[in-house]
Amino acid sequence: MRGVRGRLAAFAAAGGVHLGALLTRRRGVERATKPVLMPLLAEYVLVRGGPRLLALALLLGAVGDVLLQCEGEAAFLAGMGAFAAGHGCYLALFARQPKKNACRLAVPYGAVWALSVAALWPGLPSQLRLPVALYSLLLTAMAAGAAGAGPRAAAGGALFLLSDGLIAGGLAGWPQARVPQFWVMVTYLAAQLLLVEGLLARPEGNGAGRVPGPVPGEAGQSWTAARASTMP
């Protein structure tokens, strides 16, 4: 149990340092801490015995985080592609959940997507309009799937929508809060953690693709083997 808590504490500590660096504008600390955030959360998933697909979703988020630190449109699109692949992993995980409210959820989330794209479209650079619309459709589908997987996952999906909506608003030239990247990151980190906890809390989220062996009492002994087992 201490091993599990230690992994979660490491993620929380790194997240706190990163957010503090954003607020104090310590660019070097910000850039150094961002790439380690999702790998730390993926490690927590693995020592909890969670699905490898969930760890992969987080590692794809780490790739996106790194790419979005780079300058240029190509890096931005590649980062968006990495996050899109991560959302695909989440969708595959949510597909294992009971689908009691799937149709009812599709309507409001579809409306949110359509209204958001319509509002953002005029302000977006022309070359980013279609990629942003397609990415946001996948993100909205992920959030809708999360909404059917319990309150924590639902909150995580909603916060992911908010976080990426803040980024899209910046691209479209909308007014930004002070230190906008802080709000992007605090909602993003909370979103990923809530999605993880929501999926780990459900038996369906710990089925196929689970890393064999580790349980909370043995977690501290199993990270090396678990990490190796997730490599392609």
Positions of PLM-derived features:
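Polytopic alpha-helical membrane-helix bundles and their juxtamembrane interface segments
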Residues: 1-232
